[in-house]
Amino acid sequence: MGEIRLVNIGFGNIVSANRIVAIVSPESAPIKRIISEARERGTLIDATYGRRTRAVVITDSDHVVLSAVQPETVAHRLTARDASLAAAEEEEGEE
């Protein structure tokens, strides 16, 4: 199946990076609608610890995760992890 990769979405909360479809801002009406529908379906995960929602993580399992960190920060953590994995794989290949 492949290696499980994880990304920190703030306050020690971690999401499977392999399952992330989108990381978006919660400001637009369509995203607010997605949040509301997920709440009704029981697939909303609030990981904000009572703080303001700054990022909405949408997964391939239709779960919607609310995060208190900026979407850019989550994306940076995700891409930084990918870059470090690629560098480690290159080093292994050189040995």
Curated annotation (Swiss-Prot):
InterPro entries in the record: RemA-like (IPR007169)
Disulfide bridges in this chain: none
Domain of life: Bacteria
Family: Belongs to the RemA family.
Protein name: Putative regulatory protein STH1338
Phylogenetic lineage: Bacteria, Bacillati, Bacillota, Clostridia, Eubacteriales
